[in-house]
Design a protein with these regions (language model features):
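Gly/Ser/Thr-rich phosphate-binding loop
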Residues: 12-15, 33, 41-46, 55-123, ...
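Conserved AMP-binding/adenylation subdomain of ANL enzymes
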Residues: 2-42, 57
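Alpha-helix/helix-capping structural signal
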Residues: 49-52, 78, 160-161
Length: 177
């Protein structure tokens, strides 16, 4: 899902997509940051693994590059731990750029949870449920719990990206899935 969005959405809005071959730290440890700087990247999508790998080279490595073209950052692919999240927010987002953490995937119909520019940022968290999913936290009996209480995460509605049927064969879809 993310790959398809990355490939299609920039051109739909008149933008460009930067795809780099190879590893982000070869032939030198500044390669990734130099690509962002030289191409004046405005929208950056990362996975926590990438940031953990790059932050090991130290703060000075990234501080030597001009990343002022960045306007928004997005992450996905895995959960964040606090140290890389804080490092990324401080050194790349400069404690002010929107940093949208997204959970979803092709197999779940798209975006289930996302950060927003309207909600405060907290390490590893999401601002809200994806459009229409009806996210809720419930107890063992399936009843909603009060804010701040521990419970189980449920999605009460199907994701808007879920397949509804097979082409001209609703019955086969219902029988199969």
């Amino acid at each position: 899902m993310v790959g398809a969005m990355c490939a299609c959405i920039p051109s739909y809005f008149g933008g460009s997509l930067l795809v780099a071959e190879g590893t982000p730290d070869f032939p030198d440890t500044g390669r990734f940051w130099r690509l962002l700087q030289d191409h004046k990247v405005t929208y950056l999508g990362v996975a926590p693994t990438l940031i953990r790998g790059l932050m090991r080279y130290g703060d000075a490595e990234v501080e030597g590059f001009d990343l002022s073209s960045l306007r928004v950052t997005v992450s996905g692919g895995e959960a964040w731990t606090e140290a890389p999240w804080r490092w990324f927010f401080e050194h790349i987002c400069k404690n002010k750029l929107p940093f949208l953490n997204i959970v979803g995937g092709t197999e779940v119909g798209g975006c289930n949870f996302t950060g927003t520019v309207l909600h405060p940022l907290r390490p590893g968290s999401f601002g809200m449920g994806g459009l229409g999913v009806g996210a809720d936290i419930v107890d063992d009996a399936g009843k909603p719990v009060a804010a701040g209480q521990v419970g189980e995460l449920v999605l009460r509605n199907p994701n808007i990206g879920f397949t509804k049927s097979l082409w001209r064969d609703d019955e086969r879809y219902l029988d199969s899935y």
